[in-house]
Amino acid sequence: MRCLGLMSGTSADGVDAVLADFRGSPNHPQWELIRHVHSPYPEGLRHRVVSAGQGETGCAEQWLDLAEAITEAQAKAARSCDPHGEAVLVGCHGQTVWHRPPTSQQRGASWQLLQAPLLAQLLERPVVHD
């Protein structure tokens, strides 16, 4: 089964995409890397993501617009890595905007932006997300 994974972290430099082929049992899977691509964010989008992570405030509409722009960039990276649509599903957690490591007083948490249903629609395949 071919699967596509998308990753974008707090560096906000773009999307890393990997197409891999998985075989074998779920307990002992074997996998093979088929292709990987780094798709840089356009400078304007990178600036918006970094600003959001540094605490820039905005209204709900601006956050939704940013999530949609990130989703479109994720779709572009996916198409670049899997131009023939070989993957049967896509795994994507979205763009990490803020990551809080755990401390003795507070649990760790991350905040990601993604419109997963939109990504599934754009790629015409299921998207696994959190």
Protein language model features and the residues they cover:
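Short acidic/glycine-rich loops and adjacent helix/strand connectors
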Residues: 1-130
